[in-house]
Amino acid sequence: MKRVDAHGLKIAPVLFDFIAKEAAPKTGIAPDAFWAGVAAIIKDLGPKNRALLALRDALQAKIDDWHRANKGKAFDLNAYTAFLKEIGYLVPEPATQKVETANVDEEIGKICGPQLVVPLTNARYALNAANARWGSLYDAFYGTDAIPHDPSESGKGYNKARGDKVIAKAKAFLDAAVPLATGSHTDVTAYSIVAGQLAVKLKSGNATALKNAAQFAGFQGDAAAPSAVLLVNNGLHVEVTINRNSAIGKDDPAGVADMVMEAAVSTILDMEDSVAAVDAEDKVLVYRNTLGLMNGTLSADFEKGGKTLTRSLNADRSYKTPDGKGEVKLHGRSLLLMRNCGHHMFTDAVLDERGEEVPEGLLDAAVSGLLAIHDLKGNSKVKNSRTGSAYIVKPKMHGPDEVSFTCEIFDRVEKMLGLPENTLKVGIMDEERRTTVNLKACIQRASKRIMFINTGFLDRTGDEIHTSMEAGPMIRKNEMKAQAWIKAYEDWNVDMGLIDGLPGHAQIGKGMWAAPDKMADMLAQKLAHPQAGATTAWVPSPTAATLHALHYHQVNVIARQEELTKGGPRAKLSDILTIPVSKSNWAPDDVKQEIDNNCQGILGYVVRWIDQGVGCSKVPDIHDVGLMEDRATLRISSQHLANWLHQGVITEAQVMESLKRMAVVVDKQNAGDAIYKPMAPAFDGVAFKAACDLIFKGREQPNGYTEYILTARRREAKAAG
């Protein structure tokens, strides 16, 4: 490949052309000026980036030495804490200072609700996520196990018995969230608007109204016979769709055909853990899809029922005000946030003046800023931010100095692009241990830019294992969620967010529900996230977003945060620093089960990543339950096995035997995939080798990250065709 030279950089032609012909036009930024700015940022900040990574390695080496020096002794938490302070891992906690982030959209500062994460390599998925601001509650109940499946309800076509259960459950939700003054929504025969109020007729013949008249927010159609009634609860809207001629509405006493929930309030467009972007072509695909979302032109064709359909961004939703005289406009799409790569990644899409790969996070920030201009300047028929902000999630930062570095990058990008100061907002992923223990300082370093903090249990566990690799054998993977450090970590995140005044300025978020087919379990368990004071939490699909929205109707998060603030902080640093090592002597069958579970999960994810470039997918686990896997789950599994190997719990021979046995299982699970390349019986493919590397070289991977091995092996697979 002949690269394009510009300002000392050597740029892949596909990226150079994308910036010149697609990204830069209509932004007011000349392509040459863009590359001049990028070159200056890389020259000035590249060395600082490398120095921060070197500090990570130096701190890890000191921690490893400390554990080795104290091997065989009872763990002394006070001595350990003092040591972490001495080496600069644990910094002094700053005085409380409230954040000052300005110009954030309501979806960040005011509205509480679900958050989707979507890989930017797939345009249709990205559009589905952006459009998941609204979702059918009837469809979500009908198509999932949120209502248990009765064998008698199976078959093609609509099953009325199941449909009746769906309608009953949906109306029970409405009774709880938007109750009537008397009676139930189940007994309604007509909704109408009289004198700016919702008038409700019951089958008894009696008239009633909403218990709280302010929950009526608008309508569509005629006041006497509306086609939609808009209700609101805890800041989230519900549209009751009325159509007496529809298949569902014709049998409903009030003609109700559906309930459309305001669902995915925000969506993370992912350039990081859920994508396999290893070269310039991959990066341009990610950037091009982002551009299409920022300028409103993205579309995707797909086949359904023998027809070709085109998906594009939904328009805003329009209703009449309750008095019928004005208009209520509601956002038709999720607020879009862009997740860039972390400081540790490098890309060959651009080489610096020494011919070395440049920090990928620097390139991502510059391109993200450029693409956001299309939204900020109004180049799109639909708006993302209404307040002049662009939202960038920054993952895998270790401690406050790295947060400061991110803010410095954003400052340079704003100056380069002529954007007002603090246009680029930052989401801090609290997924590395050094960020957790110094979270207050991290928040304050970004006090004018911060737009969210979010716990990421999966990556955080991977870092927990790697940081304390020398401390001893870790407990079994499935026991990790029950440990004291996990509860403290989750509570600490909310505590610090409330202390630093994030409400009104930034989201406080919780992690992913990883089982997209287990919606009944999600409904039972994920209520805990808003109850914990989180304003948002991650879901794996638009349907899951629709169902998780129910939890924000059950819990008034703003009121819950006020309760928690009055109660004071709940988490203790001492619990967070308690290392999850085990003194157990596990039975041989338990050890074998742990190895098999980890090996199967690693192979199931890695084989698609390496051979097909799929960075996030629903991978069947060892029990054939589909789980959403990305690099975070891979990090835990590979680090867990690396720890047990290093601590002598298991042998390389045991792991290799399991890998080969589990490869056969994974091959069978993928038998229906026409482009799948089996790993057995040769076990010599690039994907199988990558899985081996992740385990057997896991201890030497910086912070236990999987990206370096995955990227190298994916490039190898692409080169081999």
Curated annotation (Swiss-Prot):
A GO term from the CC aspect: cytosol
* Pathway recorded for this protein: Carbohydrate metabolism; glyoxylate cycle; (S)-malate from isocitrate: step 2/2
**So where does this one cross the membrane?**
none
**Ubl conjugation in keyword set:** no
Q: Where in the cell is it found?
A: Cytoplasm
Sites where the protein binds Mg(2+) = E431, D459
Indicate whether Magnesium appears among the record's keywords. yes
User: Subunit details for this protein?
Assistant: Monomer.
Q: What is this protein called?
A: Malate synthase G
Q: Which organism is it from?
A: Bradyrhizobium diazoefficiens (strain JCM 10833 / BCRC 13528 / IAM 13628 / NBRC 14792 / USDA 110)
